[in-house]
C-alpha cells in the first residue's frame, strides 16, 4: 500500500511515489513529516535495485528523465505509437545522476517464437482473438489456438487481425530476433524486454 496507495485515483502523485521508492530501496530517509517516514525496506543489502520507469506516454518519459533513471517504452501496449516522441523527450530532458550519467533506454515488446513460422502463427491465434476483443473492452481468457482460429470472424475483423499479424514479432526464433534487433537499432535502444503469453506454456 505504501508503495502505490490509491494509484488510479491520484496519478499526479506518481512522481512522489517514485521518489519514495528510490529512498526506500537505497536506505535513505524520507522527510520527517512524510506519513511513511518511519517505514524502512528490509532486508537492506550491499547493492541497490535498479529502478526503471515502464511507460507508454510522454509523461512516464518525463518522470524517468527527471529522476535520472532508465526508461522503458511499453511497445507491446501501443504497438510503438508514441515511442519515438517519448524516447526523444526522455533523452533531451534527462538529468544525469551518479549511477546513470547518461540516458539508458529500453523497449518492452510482445513476441512469440516457435520452430516454424506456421507453428508460431498457429499459437498467435489465441492472442489475435484476445486482442481483438480487448480493444472493445472485453477481456476474454486466452483460448486454445485451435478454438480461437475457428471463431467466425467478420471480414473487418479478419482484416484487423491480418494488420496485427503484419506488425507482430511472431515466427521462428531467428526471424523474431532479427526483427527485435532491427527495432532496437532503429531507435537506439540499450536493452530489450520481451513479454509472451500463450494458451500452453509448453508450446
Positions of the model-derived regions?
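Glycine-rich, proline-tolerant flexible connector loops at the mouths of alpha/beta enzymes
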Residues: 75-77, 195-202
Amino acid at each position: 500500500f505504501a508503495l502505490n496507495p490509491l494509484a488510479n485515483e491520484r496519478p499526479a502523485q506518481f512522481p512522489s511515489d517514485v521518489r519514495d521508492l528510490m529512498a526506500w530501496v537505497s536506505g535513505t530517509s524520507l522527510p520527517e513529516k512524510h506519513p511513511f517516514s518511519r517505514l524502512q525496506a528490509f532486508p537492506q543489502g550491499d547493492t541497490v535495485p535498479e529502478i526503471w520507469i515502464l511507460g507508454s506516454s510522454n509523461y512516464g518519459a518525463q518522470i524517468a528523465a527527471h529522476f535520472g533513471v532508465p526508461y522503458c517504452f511499453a511497445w507491446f501496449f501501443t504497438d510503438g505509437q508514441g515511442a519515438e516522441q517519448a524516447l526523444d523527450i526522455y533523452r533531451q530532458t534527462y538529468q544525469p545522476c551518479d549511477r546513470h550519467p547518461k540516458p539508458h533506454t529500453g523497449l518492452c515488446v510482445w513476441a512469440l517464437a516457435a520452430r516454424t513460422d506456421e507453428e508460431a502463427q498457429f499459437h498467435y491465434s489465441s492472442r489475435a482473438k484476445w486482442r481483438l476483443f480487448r480493444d472493445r473492452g472485453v477481456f476474454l481468457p486466452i483460448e486454445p489456438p485451435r478454438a480461437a482460429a475457428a471463431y467466425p470472424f467478420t471480414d473487418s475483423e479478419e482484416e484487423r487481425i491480418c494488420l496485427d499479424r503484419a506488425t507482430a514479432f511472431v515466427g521462428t526464433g531467428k526471424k523474431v530476433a532479427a526483427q527485435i534487433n532491427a527495432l532496437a537499432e532503429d531507435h537506439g535502444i540499450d536493452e530489450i524486454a520481451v513479454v509472451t503469453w500463450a494458451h500452453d506454456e509448453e508450446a
